Every structure is written in structure tokens, then in C-alpha cells.
Amino acid sequence: MTAMFRSFASFNYRTWFAGAVISNIGGWMQATAQDWVVLTELTDNDATAMGVTMALQFGPPLLLVSLTGWVADRFDRRKVLLTTQTTLMLLALGVAALLLTGVMTLPLMFCFAAAFGVTNAFDAPARQAFVSDMVSLEDTSNAVALNSASFNMARLIGPAVGGLLIVALGSGWVFVANAVTFLAMIVALLLMRTNELVPRVKNRASGGLAEGFRYVAGRPDLIVVFVMVFLIGAFGMNFPIFASTMALEFGQGADGYGLLSSVLAIGSLTGALLAARRDRARVRVLVIAAGGFGVASLVSAAMPTYWAYATVLIFVGFSTVTMLTTANGYVQTTTTPALRGRVLALYMAVVMGATPIGAPIAGWVADAFGPRAAIVVGGVAGLLAFTIGIGWMLWSGRLHRREDARFLLTLDETRPLSVVKAMQPRAFEDRATAATTPIRLPRDTED
């Protein structure tokens, strides 16, 4: 088994991956349909209403973070996921029924978006933490990256198929199709060999989420990761708003919008697969990806034609997934196992909770000044995140310039600063391969 796919050695992970691909395809089909329904069927191209829908859907993870992280740590994650996946399937059927009978309204769609958000608030941290239950710690970063690859394989297919189904059959049937795909994930969870799951570390302390907050507060590296992800998540990752309004600007319909989402996934899938090749997640990769995202977003905003814009989206997708996969893997592999669920709940609250803040703003900017202006705001947020990351690395001593123009890494990026013993910096050449080649510490300096 190659290094890129080493997590497939686990039966449970192979089963999970297969179910996730099918379910994620349906999820992307539904996301495309929901965005298009709000933008064109329930409103007259109102991007602000679309932003409100996204805020309602992604707000609950932020509001419920104190509960969802505790649930992910306290209860059997497989059973939690069976519950959330079944609930999401029933909600999809509910939306389908209202659309097919012609009684769906914007307030009702807002209510369903909030219900999806509440359910996903419990699903996301349990789903992320469950990855570490299926594979060893050494393979966790690889499994996280392959999860992202699964997500983006689905993103490559789902939006395009969803757009075609909207044109051919109508939006309601897309929600029906998504409900059916949830069965794949439910069956995969039922087929799990529970005796092969990695034993979980029980935390007997009663600190709840406060303990997770204290843990993150004592980890400057995690704080920087959270801030960078928040900035880009709030203002740069409003792709449904950007892609749908740009599709309309270029005179495209639902199929053109779906194709843009699929093109974005080409770069996303590439980024996920490259991340799977790395043996661990590193902060500097996250920082570089944030800068790449900012530049690619600004370039995309200037594109004069539909196909030129679509081409640049490949680079936007690549940098986005490289950043998110690295951040996720870093949080998972450097967090104390007993607190992993709570810390991941905080991370998911930052990732998903940033949307309620940024999406309405992006929608308003798109309505008032045009979609290109909204994309520029996202690009600037990416460059700001890059600046914060570089500034922290310089301030913390992780990275500094030498007179011979080579960079030095002075600390192991996969550990909290407090646990790394003092050592002399080790130089490496400033060339392209340095970004993906881990730097090994001498054995006698490791804990």
C-alpha cells in the first residue's frame, strides 16, 4: 500500500471512505440545489437572502459548541453519527416534499437551513474525531487528508450532476436523491468492526468545554491556526455566493453554476491528495496556502470570461483544501486525545461558525457592489491570514531569515511550543521541496 493510501489498510476506514464518497456526492447535489432555489426560485437573485440561509445553516456549530464537543467526547461517536445521518436524511426528504408540492417558501427554507445546521453541529465534531478512532495516530493526518479527498471527489461530481438534475427534473428531486445517498453512510457505520476501533482515552475531569478552551488558550500555535482559518472561512470561503452570482454575471444558468463548483473541486481534490502524501501536518504549509488563496482569489475577481474565471478557481480550490486539510490534521495530531472532541468542536465552530458572520456581508457586498467586489474582500482576508501566520512564525522563533537568505526552522511544528526542548536551529535549502519535506529532530532532543 502506497504512503498516499496507507489508511486503507484499515477495513473500517475503507468502509467509511466508500460510504462517505456516495453520501458526499448527494450532499453537494443538495447544496447546489438549495443555493439555486434560494437565489432564483424563492427570491429574485437576492444574494443577501442566500447569505442569511448560509448563516442559519452554519451558525449552530458556533452557538452549540459547548454541547457538541462534549457529546463527541462523551458518547459513542459511531452511534452519534448514525443518529445525525438519519436525521439529515429525514430533513432532506422534508425539503423535497415541500418543493415537489410547490409550497416551499423562503421562511420555511430558513427553518430547514437552521435544522440542518443544528444537526450538522453535532455531526461535524463527531465525524472529525471518529477518524482517529479508525486509524492509528501515525496515520491520522493521512486519514484526514483522504477524508478531504473523498469530500472533494464528491464535490467534483455532485454540483455538476445537481445542476443537470435541476434543469432536467427540478430542485425537489435533487433533495430526494440526496436522502437516498445517506443510506450509504448509514450502512457503512453499521458494517464497522467495533472491536477494531482504536480504544478511546477517557477523560475523568469535569471541566467540559472550559477545559478545551483552557487547552487551546495555552497553545499559541492553535490560536494562530484558528485565527487564520476564521478569517478565510468568514470572508473568503463563501463559494456558493461567489460562484452563483458570478455565474449569473456571465449569463449562465443552474448547470453553469454547478460546473463552477465542480471545477473548484479539481483543485481541491489535487490539494487533498498531495496532503495525503505528507507524513504530518505543518504550520508553514498552512501559511503558504493562505497566501496562495489570497492571490488566487484576487486574480479570479479580475477574470473577464466564464472559462477564465473557472480556470482560476482550480487554484482557489487547491489552496483552500491544502489550508483546511493541514489545519484539521494539525489540530487532530497535536491535541491531547482526551480533549480531542472538544478541541475539534472548537475548530469546527471556527470553520463553520465563521460563515454566519461573513456570508451575509459577502451577500450584501455582492448585491451592492457586484460579485467581484465580494471576492476581493475574500482575497484580502487570505492575505491578512498569511501575514498573521508569517508574523507569528517570526515572532515565535519558528522561522527567521539568515544573511544568506535561507530560512531556519527552530521548533518542531507538530508539537506545542512548551514541550520542545531548546536546540540549535537546523538549516535547509530554500527550494520548492522544502515545503513538503519534514525536518527530523535529533533523537536525543525529542521527548
Task: Walk through the language-model features, giving the residues of each.
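Long, low-complexity, intrinsically disordered segments
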Residues: 216, 430-447
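Alpha-helical transmembrane-bundle signature of multi-pass membrane transport and export proteins
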Residues: 1-429
